[in-house]
């Protein structure tokens, strides 16, 4: 059976809506692939609640890394962990999906390099055919839609545009198995440090604009 992994982008223990949209798209893609298993990748600190919530939005299973090195977003430890999980997986995913948020784009670009595969960014539509995933990709400021496919490289690493897919209705009380994993890097192996956040007041995130 095919496998799909979905990176759940979160901030301070709260998942972004785009993550649940991506999870919903993954479930539809799984049906196209004949019933693939959808696994949520939840990375951060104090995020076990997000892993549990992922089942309500369609995840069949979840992998959780809850560690201080992932408390603040730094692309290297996140990408290194996704790459390591893929390399060590007994049943490797055919596809790794994530939301095309700032963090999602950064993580997937670096993870694709570490895995020696291609990355398809900012998908606005997705479907499976003959073992490959076809992604509708907007070009020229959305005036043209192209179809992109990675026919030979695996895993297929894809980010999906926020609000391009509907957010699924949560199934309250749905549960599943959570596999806890260790981080790929120790703190002294990470070269960057987050010292704080600057809030830009009066502006709305484009990802949340209605």
Name each model feature, range by range:
Residues 1-210:
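N-terminal glycine-rich FAD/FM-binding segment characteristic of electron-transfer flavoproteins
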């Amino acid at each position: 059976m095919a496998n799909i992994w979905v990176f759940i982008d979160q901030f301070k223990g709260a998942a972004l809506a785009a993550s649940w949209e991506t999870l919903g798209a993954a479930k539809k893609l799984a049906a196209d692939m004949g019933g693939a298993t959808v696994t949520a990748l939840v990375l951060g600190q104090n995020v076990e609640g997000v892993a549990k919530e992922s089942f309500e939005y369609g995840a069949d299973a979840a992998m959780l890394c809850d560690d201080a090195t992932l408390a603040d977003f730094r692309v290297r430890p996140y990408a290194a962990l996704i790459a390591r999980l893929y390399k060590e997986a007994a049943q490797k995913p055919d596809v790794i999906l994530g939301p095309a948020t700032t963090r999602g784009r950064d993580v997937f670009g670096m993870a694709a390099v570490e895995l020696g595969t291609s990355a398809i960014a900012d998908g606005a539509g997705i479907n499976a055919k003959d073992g490959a995933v076809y992604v509708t990709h907007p070009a020229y400021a959305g005036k043209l839609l192209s179809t992109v496919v990675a026919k030979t490289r695996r895993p297929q690493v894809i980010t999906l545009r926020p609000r391009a897919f509907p957010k699924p209705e949560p199934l309250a009380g749905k549960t599943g198995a959570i596999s806890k994993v260790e981080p790929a890097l120790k703190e002294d192996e990470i070269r960057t440090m987050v010292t704080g956040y600057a809030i830009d007041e009066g502006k709305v995130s484009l990802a949340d604009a209605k």
